[in-house]
Design a protein with these regions (language model features):
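Extracellular beta-strand/beta-solenoid scaffold signature
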Residues: 85-93, 122-126, 131-132, 151-166, ...
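Extracellular beta-rich repeat passengers
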Residues: 117, 343-413
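Structured core elements
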Residues: 15, 68-69, 189, 211, ...
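Short, solvent-exposed linear motifs at loop/edge-of-secondary-structure regions
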Residues: 1-8, 63, 311-327
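Right-handed parallel beta-helix
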Residues: 102-113, 151, 171-185, 194-209, ...
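Short strand-connecting beta-turns/loops that link adjacent beta-strands
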Residues: 7-10, 63, 98, 193-195, ...
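Active-site lining segments that contact anionic ligands and/or coordinate catalytic metals
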Residues: 55, 64, 257, 280, ...
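Extracellular polysaccharide-degrading/modifying enzymes targeting complex plant/algal/animal polysaccharides
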Residues: 1-169, 174-177, 220-231
Length: 413
């Protein structure tokens, strides 16, 4: 949220509201400014009448309580249908650890038109995957951790964005052939303490935030670099099956969001999905920036098709992992067609596959990518990389993505 703009010659001094201003400028990487190595940190300004210059854009004058809209070609405002969402969550399925909600199936239901007001009211400083910082500090000099982990240059505490459909403390809550469209934040969120659940044949389209979230991304009072391994294993999201879904036009407002983001999860299977037109990575698996063993294990990302990704953000990959995840696999996926936006922090910091800090005991095998641009950053032990790149059997490329019975999702208007 902008507090003031003061023009100074050919420049302008922009000041932001608190607390987000302090939190953002404490953020260690990428720094929100031009750095000494010449890397850029761009700012994207919205909601000013002067910026209303492209058809389809709008401006909300909050003082006058008036909305200005620049019509697209052929649109007539006298005949326009306008949707102004007023609710953040449409459906909430919530039990307790001792009395979970069980065996509910949603089939052929459309979930549409939600909002999310927190960024307008309190600001929004995202860390990653749409998780926003409620507080954060830079650490100088860096804090030494145990021998397994790199020194720590920051600490952060996170909040979780709203979702159109929330599932908490439940078992086997399924979504078959549903549509999640025109949403102001996350589409579907298996938030905490959920066992089982199938998401199959669903369309996720035109969503401001993440398409689908699974599992904890650090509880609110838990510093985000600490491993999460609750004594009561019922708190962990496990055994979700996400397959044959189509994700497109995700993260339209919050550019650090993904089609599918799974945090501290176990036995999760993500396969035969197609992902396109996303601002950042396609699939993110894991959390924590630590090699320390935690509750994550036995996860599988298999035969997904990811293309036309990274529309706005770098430090990115088609498939991205974090943290120690014994017996986890990234196999037979197809990744191609990355965008090349001109304003990213570092124009070379993009990849097809990316195992980030603490990634351990993960097998990355037989993935078709149009080049061999990968990153293994501050990884732990036990990772296996075998047979990835453009020379992988073309059958892998052909099999990736939606299976025959679900290709109709690509043609839904």
């Amino acid at each position: 949220r902008i507090r003031s703009i003061e023009v100074q010659g050919d420049s302008a001094a922009v000041r932001f509201h608190q607390p987000e201003s302090r939190i953002q400028f404490e953020h260690p990487w990428p720094r929100p400014m031009v750095t000494t190595d010449g890397h850029n940190s761009a700012f994207y300004l919205t909601n000013a009448r002067e910026l209303l210059d492209v058809p389809g854009e709008w401006y909300h004058d909050m003082n006058a309580r008036r909305v200005y809209y620049y019509p697209r070609e052929g649109e007539k405002m006298q005949e326009a249908e306008v949707m102004a969402p007023a609710i953040e969550t449409l459906v909430q399925v919530e039990g307790t650890l001792d009395r979970p909600v069980c065996h509910i199936r949603f089939e052929k239901i459309t979930f549409s038109y939600t909002t999310w007001m927190r960024p307008s009211e309190k600001g929004h400083v995202p860390l990653q995957a749409g998780m926003y910082l409620t507080d954060g500090y830079r650490i100088d000099p860096k804090m030494q951790r145990n021998y397994l982990n790199h020194p720590l240059d920051n600490q952060g505490w996170l909040g979780r964005p709203a979702a159109a459909v929330r599932v908490v403390a439940a078992r086997q809550i399924d979504f078959e052939r549903c549509r999640f469209e025109h949403l102001g934040s996350t589409g579907l969120d298996y938030e905490e303490a959920v066992q089982g659940g199938v998401v199959r044949g669903c369309l996720f389209r035109d969503i401001a935030g993440n398409g689908l979230l699974v599992g904890s991304f650090s509880p609110a009072a838990h510093e985000t670099h600490l491993p999460y391994d609750p004594a009561d294993r019922r708190e962990v999201c496990t055994q979700q099956q996400i397959n044959n879904c189509y994700f497109t036009e995700i993260g339209n407002e919050d550019w650090g969001c993904l089609a599918i983001a799974a945090g501290y999860v176990g036995d999760v299977n993500i396969e035969h999905n197609e992902i396109s037109e996303v601002p950042y990575s396609g699939i993110s698996l894991g959390w924590g920036w630590t090699q320390t063993v935690n509750c994550m294990r036995n996860n599988r990302v298999h035969a997904n098709l990811i293309h036309h990704y990274a529309k706005h953000m770098y430090d990115v990959a088609g498939i991205y992992t974090l943290g120690s995840q014994p017996k986890s696999y990234v196999t037979e996926n197809c990744v191609h067609s990355i965008y090349k936006p001109g304003y990213v922090h570092d124009p070379n910091h993009w990849f097809y596959l990316y195992t980030d800090e603490g990634s351990s005991f993960i097998t990355v095998r037989d993935n078709w990518t149009e080049g061999e641009k990968y990153l293994q950053n501050a990884n732990g032990p036990g990772n296996v990389w075998e047979n990835n790149g453009p020379k992988v059997d073309n059958d892998v490329r052909e099999r990736a993505g939606l299976e025959a019975g679900y290709k109709d999702l690509l043609n839904i208007q």
